[in-house]
């Protein structure tokens, strides 16, 4: 009986520590989701502002080209639909989110420099991407979702954005900016979805459907 009473304080401390870790984890998820929501809204605004400067025929042509083209980050294997997203583990969603954010660290700077419409958003983009990457890394390290078996895709360096690091001038520059903005918006939407699902899973909510 005495041993039981001795164990009770230990169990209580362990319980409080576990609750504290869960609260901190949820706090980090809240911050990460808030940051990526801001980035997604910013990406939408940037794309809409740029799209508004185009002529109707120019807009239609660029949209057709983009639908046939692909984003640099498409080489990162990620869920193809809502069903696959919901089947993915928390840790897998965090790893994919980390890779997607990482893939935009340099291209976003190039885009800002090349387009005068985006200069005012420069600090917001670079700071938010950097903060979000650090936050997701903390969530990965603190995740108790099990070990993730990373395939070769996760260790590969992303291909460069073709000629996007150069300044083609004229129509080439317009197409490059359109594609980068469209891809940035697309990827921020992906990360927002993945982090929202992961956060819901960690909060033990009954319904995490998209």
Swiss-Prot record:
InterPro entries: 4_helix_cytokine-like_core, Somatotropin, Somatotropin/Prolactin, Somatotropin_CS. Pfam families: Hormone_1 (PF00103). GO terms for cellular component: extracellular space. GO terms for molecular function: growth hormone activity; growth hormone receptor binding; metal ion binding. Keywords: Disulfide bond, Hormone, Metal-binding, Secreted, Signal, Zinc. Disulfide bonds join 71-183, 200-208. GO terms for biological process: animal organ development; calcium ion homeostasis; growth hormone receptor signaling pathway; hyperosmotic salinity response; magnesium ion homeostasis; positive regulation of growth; positive regulation of phagocytosis; positive regulation of receptor signaling pathway via JAK-STAT. Zn(2+) binds at residues 38, 192. Residues 1-22 form the signal peptide. It is found in: Secreted. Belongs to the somatotropin/prolactin family. Growth hormone plays an important role in growth control and is involved in the regulation of several anabolic processes. Implicated as an osmoregulatory substance important for seawater adaptation. PANTHER family: SOMATOTROPIN, SOMATOTROPIN,PROLACTIN. This is Somatotropin. The lineage of its organism: Eukaryota, Metazoa, Chordata, Craniata, Vertebrata. The gene is gh.
